[in-house]
């Protein structure tokens, strides 16, 4: 039998996933910020098996490079085996054994790649229970209110597992059974190898079922064990997008609850979505309609939302981000962002800074205490500390061929509707007048004004727009003031 301490895990991910109706391989469909397969591999890596391999078939050329990336992230090898033709789960396991050493004789855990909520504790418990009983196989089971599509667990009157019958091959009475195969097993590898050689495709699907191994091993007189998982979501599989959405919602519910128990206020969990790799500090408040995605990091005592989506954004302690869409950006401690701000990749807002209503930023560094209050585009720019950018200003960064940068110093005050035509530098302490087009560098402490003196052409409306509402209003105003219509001869 198996030697304690020797563990290998085989993940079956060769199926085409036709019920997903998708060009994307089933195991690559995301939920909670990772693909289904990535979730599973991260969980298994925590168990630290000696060997970990994934069996691929359909779209293996798309999945294998991602597995290599995940292996690097996890700091451990993950082998790949190929099932050339889809001949069932039994054949997939036989192909997977080729990724293990020929003399491997320890515990072999087999699981499907579409069980994204399977966690390390459940796998570790399976291995421990299997090793303690020295069984030939231990299968995880769960009980479902609607077991349609799942293999049923057959037991004797003494409650011993005798076989697993697939739904397509089950009789009407067997389909009434609610205890189902969770698709996760721990095998004695030597016993498994022997049973695989005796599998038959004499079934409704004309495939080699891994589940048939149970009856074969029982026929050999070997001990069969089952471990029931009360939390069925942990072993639930995904075959279509309805199930994907259901498991995604369940995963999100667990993620949100974990943050709440850690000291985060989530006002409306039903409309708040948080990816698994997101971190949030204590006493932060998350308002309804907020999505925190990717590797977003939120500090403590922050206010985020409502109606905010942040992807790979870092937010410092005490910051406020309201009705904002941000990606690949950093918001400093005590800063305020929004409402209706758009932070594009490369945005860095310093501590106590402000990006107000209808401000868009991209590839821009905005210093400590600097304010961009409203209606402004800041792209490819570096702004110093404690400056103020007037409303409706634009950093004109594109000349039709390439992007160019603008540098604005510290303690700068710019008037509304200033255009910075890059490349240009505005020195520390400089000012610009309203409506200025900055085409040349502005020295420190200077006032830049590009507009000429205002010229009023009196009587223009009466002459050019006679009879218009504007002309009538102007005439009435002039008469009320006791004056003669502008431009009329005495």
Curated annotation (Swiss-Prot):
It is found in: Cytoplasm. GO terms for biological process: cell morphogenesis; cell wall organization; lipid A biosynthetic process; peptidoglycan biosynthetic process; regulation of cell shape; UDP-N-acetylglucosamine biosynthetic process. Keywords: Acyltransferase, Cell shape, Cell wall biogenesis/degradation, Cytoplasm, Magnesium, Metal-binding, Multifunctional enzyme, Nucleotidyltransferase, Peptidoglycan synthesis, Repeat, Transferase. Acetyl-CoA binds at residues 391, 397-398, 416, 434. InterPro entries: Bifunctional_GlmU (IPR005882), GlmU-like (IPR050065), GlmU_C_LbH (IPR038009), Hexapep (IPR001451), MobA-like_NTP_Trfase (IPR025877), Nucleotide-diphossugar_trans (IPR029044), Trimer_LpxA-like_sf (IPR011004). Pathway: Nucleotide-sugar biosynthesis; UDP-N-acetyl-alpha-D-glucosamine biosynthesis; N-acetyl-alpha-D-glucosamine 1-phosphate from alpha-D-glucosamine 6-phosphate (route II): step 2/2; Nucleotide-sugar biosynthesis; UDP-N-acetyl-alpha-D-glucosamine biosynthesis; UDP-N-acetyl-alpha-D-glucosamine from N-acetyl-alpha-D-glucosamine 1-phosphate: step 1/1; Bacterial outer membrane biogenesis; LPS lipid A biosynthesis. Its EC number is 2.7.7.23, 2.3.1.157. Residues 1-241 are annotated as: Pyrophosphorylase. Residues 242-262 are annotated as: Linker. It catalyses: alpha-D-glucosamine 1-phosphate + acetyl-CoA = N-acetyl-alpha-D-glucosamine 1-phosphate + CoA + H(+); N-acetyl-alpha-D-glucosamine 1-phosphate + UTP + H(+) = UDP-N-acetyl-alpha-D-glucosamine + diphosphate. Residues 467-490 have a biased composition (Low complexity). Its main location: cytoplasm. Residues 263-490 are annotated as: N-acetyltransferase. GO terms for molecular function: glucosamine-1-phosphate N-acetyltransferase activity; magnesium ion binding; UDP-N-acetylglucosamine diphosphorylase activity. Residues 462-490 are annotated as: Disordered. It is an enzyme of class 2 (transferase). Pfam families: Hexapep, NTP_transf_3. The active site is at residue 374. Homotrimer. In the N-terminal section; belongs to the N-acetylglucosamine-1-phosphate uridyltransferase family. Catalyzes the last two sequential reactions in the de novo biosynthetic pathway for UDP-N-acetylglucosamine (UDP-GlcNAc). The C-terminal domain catalyzes the transfer of acetyl group from acetyl coenzyme A to glucosamine-1-phosphate (GlcN-1-P) to produce N-acetylglucosamine-1-phosphate (GlcNAc-1-P), which is converted into UDP-GlcNAc by the transfer of uridine 5-monophosphate (from uridine 5-triphosphate), a reaction catalyzed by the N-terminal domain. This is Bifunctional protein GlmU. It comes from Mycolicibacterium paratuberculosis (strain ATCC BAA-968 / K-10) (Mycobacterium paratuberculosis). The gene is glmU.
């Amino acid at each position: 039998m198996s030697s304690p301490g020797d563990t290998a895990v085989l993940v079956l991910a060769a199926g085409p996933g036709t019920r997903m109706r998708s060009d994307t391989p089933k195991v690559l469909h995301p939920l909670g910020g990772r693909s289904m397969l990535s979730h599973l591999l991260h969980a298994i890596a925590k168990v630290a098996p000696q060997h970990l391999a994934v069996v691929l078939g359909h779209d293996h050329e798309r999945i294998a490079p991602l597995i290599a990336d995940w292996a690097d992230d996890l700091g451990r090898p993950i082998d790949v085996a190929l099932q050339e033709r889809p001949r069932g789960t039994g054949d997939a396991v036989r192909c997977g054994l080729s990724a293990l050493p020929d003399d491997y004789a320890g515990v072999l855990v087999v699981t499907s790649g579409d069980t994204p909520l399977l966690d390390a504790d459940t796998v570790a418990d399976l291995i421990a229970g299997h090793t303690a009983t020295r069984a030939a196989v231990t299968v995880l089971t769960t009980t479902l209110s609607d077991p349609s599509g799942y293999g049923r667990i057959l037991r004797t009157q003494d409650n011993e597992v005798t076989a697993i019958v697939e739904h397509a091959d089950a009789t009407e009475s067997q389909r009434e059974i609610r205890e189902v195969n969770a698709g996760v097993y721990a095998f004695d590898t030597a016993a498994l190898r022997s049973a695989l050689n005796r599998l038959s495709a004499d079934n409704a699907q004309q495939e080699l079922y891994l589940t048939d191994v149970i009856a074969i091993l029982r026929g050999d007189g070997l001990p069969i064990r089952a471990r029931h998982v009360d939390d069925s979501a942990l072993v639930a599989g995904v075959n279509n997008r309805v199930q994907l959405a259901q498991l995604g919602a369940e995963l999100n519910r667990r993620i949100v609850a974990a943050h709440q128990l850690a000291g985060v206020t989530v006002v409306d969990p039903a409309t708040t979505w948080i990816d698994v790799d997101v971190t949030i500090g204590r006493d932060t408040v998350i308002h309804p309609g907020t999505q925190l995605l990717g590797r977003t990091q939120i500090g403590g005592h922050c206010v985020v939302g409502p109606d905010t989506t942040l992807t790979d954004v870092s937010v410092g302690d005490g910051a406020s981000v309201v009705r904002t869409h941000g990606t690949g950006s950093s918001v400093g401690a005590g800063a305020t962002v929004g409402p209706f701000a758009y932070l594009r990749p490369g945005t860095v807002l310093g501590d106590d800074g402000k990006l107000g209503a209808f401000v868009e930023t991209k590839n821009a560094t905005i210093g400590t205490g600097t304010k961009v209050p409203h209606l402004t585009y800041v792209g490819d720019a570096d702004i110093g500390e404690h400056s103020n950018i007037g409303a409706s200003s634009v950093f004109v960064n594109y000349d039709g061929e390439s992007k160019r940068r603008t540098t604005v110093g510290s303690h700068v005050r710019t008037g509304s509707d200033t255009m910075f035509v890059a490349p240009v530098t505005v020195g520390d302490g400089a000012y610009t007048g309203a409506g200025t087009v900055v085409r040349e560098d502005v020295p420190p402490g200077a006032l830049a004004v590009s507009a000429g003196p205002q010229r009023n052409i009196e009587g223009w409306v009466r002459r050019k727009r006679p009879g218009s509402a504007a002309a009538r209003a102007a005439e009435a105003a002039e008469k009320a003031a006791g004056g003669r219509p502008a431009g009329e001869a005495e």
